[in-house]
Every structure is written in C-alpha cells, then in structure tokens.
Amino acid sequence: MNGSKRLVAQLCQVVRSFICQPGTAVDLWQCAAGPHVFAKGSTQPICIVKLVHGQIYNLEFVYKYWCHILQSEKFPYSPVFIISNNGLAITLKCFLCEPMDLHSQFGRCLSMDTDVYLPKNTSVVLSQDDFTKFKTNLVFSKDLNVFNSMVVCRTYLTDFRQALQFLVVKAKNPKRVTAILGTIAQTLGLTPDTRSGEGGKNSERGEDDMVRRPIRAHRAGDSGGSPGTLPAEPQGAPTPPGGGLGLSSGLGLVRRWTRCAFQRYFTVLAVGAVAAATFLAGAKLTG
C-alpha cells in the first residue's frame, strides 16, 4: 500500500509540476490510492485537472514522463489521458490504463486535431500512439520523438464556446539550455550526456517553431461542430518575433532533462522542476 501511495503521489506531482506554464496555479484533485486504481479498465483516474481559458497544457511531455515512471515500475499498461466536457467544466482526467465504457462515461469521443470544438458530453481520448499520429503530417519522421517535437494544447473556454487547439512545438536549437542543465546536473552530482544538435541561425536567441495547420471554417455537418475560426488570444498576450508559440529552448530542455532522468531516476523530479521552469518561463501566445 505504501508503494501504491508513493507511485500515485509521484504521478500527481509530475502533473502538478509540468502540465502548465511556470507560476500557473493548477486546480488538481488527487485520488485515494487503492487496488482499484491499478486494475485493468479502472474507471478511477489518478488525478483530475480543471482546465481554464487561455492556458497551454504540456500534454505529451507529461504523458511521456508518466510512461517512463510506469515502465520503471514494470506496470503492464499504458496511461490514457481524457479531456472531457460534462457541461459544468472541461477537465483532464489521467488514467493508468484505458477505462471501461468510454462512451457511457465521457460521451462522444473526438479525435485529436488542430482545432477541436468540445460541446457538452464530448471528449478527446489521448493514448500511446495518438501523439505520434497527430505529428506525422506536421514534422519530419526524424522529429517525431518527444526530444525533437512536443504536442501541447491551448484552451479557449468561455460560456459560449469550448475549444481546444493542439499544436506541435519544435525547438530550433538546444544549445542555450545545455549550459543551464549542465549547471543543474553538476549541482546534483549527475553526469548527463552533453551532446546536442547543431545550431541554427537563431541559436543565440533560442527561438522555437510552432507547426500547425490553418483553422478550418465551419461546414454543415462537421462532427466537431466548428463554428469558425478561433478568436485571438486575450489582449496583453505578447507576440514573439516571427509569430508562433515561443517556448524558449523548449525541446532542447526536454532532451537534456529526460536524459538526466533516465540516468538517475530518484533525482529526476528535482532536475525536472528546475529545468522545466527554465524553458517554460519564456512562453508567449499569439492568436
């Protein structure tokens, strides 16, 4: 039982630390650990996060981190994340495996897409291969792994419309973060792999690319119920040079931090907390 509580607490801490941008309060509910949580087809999520308007959620990063932890514990199933609208709130539910009776619990299941309109009693189910399938048409095959590209979700949630935008973030160059992670690793007594990709023209600025398809206009009979393009972000959101989603040195940091994690599992959360705060601190939004 103590091992179960420790694992549940660790998984919830990963969500709390990395799902949102630094400084953002996470409205998270954690389940009580018990045998039912680890059973195949369990309908009990490990945790539930209430999503709010105008935020970016690092879904693939957290999902892959969960996969690593569960593989280390020799857990036989892959986690499943479900974003659902029950009419009262939009929530992210994190399960250790696919729950039974998805349709009866979460209504109509929609596919991950660039733009998903999420009316009442609909959901988006995210499992092992969904992130790769989504990125296949957006990045080169060599960039499909989480070290080179990462899926994030931007929310647009109001009283009149609930919508999600799934975006792919690519780092142009990881060099800016290498020195930061090297300092962290030395402080913790780690010896991370110092190899990194070659730099581009913007390596000094550490800029990132956002790859996405254009928002589609509404068509009659569209299963997603898309009423048109998403509005621009609220006023005050800064626009990075060249447009796109600026997550400073994002994927370079993921690569460096994850390599440290694989080498020293029990210190990974300390490394990750500092490192993720570093690369997410420069996040900027554009409409």
Curated annotation (Swiss-Prot):
Keywords: Host membrane, Host nucleus, Late protein, Membrane, Phosphoprotein, Transmembrane, Transmembrane helix. It comes from the Viruses. Residues 195-212 have a biased composition (Basic and acidic residues). The chain crosses the membrane at residues 265-283. It is a single-pass membrane protein. Phosphorylated. Residues 1-264 are perinuclear space. Residues 191-244 are annotated as: Disordered. Belongs to the herpesviridae NEC2 protein family. Plays an essential role in virion nuclear egress, the first step of virion release from infected cell. Within the host nucleus, NEC1 interacts with the newly formed capsid through the vertexes and directs it to the inner nuclear membrane by associating with NEC2. Induces the budding of the capsid at the inner nuclear membrane as well as its envelopment into the perinuclear space. InterPro entries: Herpesvirus_viron_egress-type. Residues 284-287 are nuclear. It holds the Pfam family Herpes_U34. It is found in: Host nucleus inner membrane. This is Nuclear egress protein 2. Forms a heterohexameric complex with NEC1. One of its GO terms (cellular component) is host cell nuclear inner membrane. The keyword Heme does not apply.
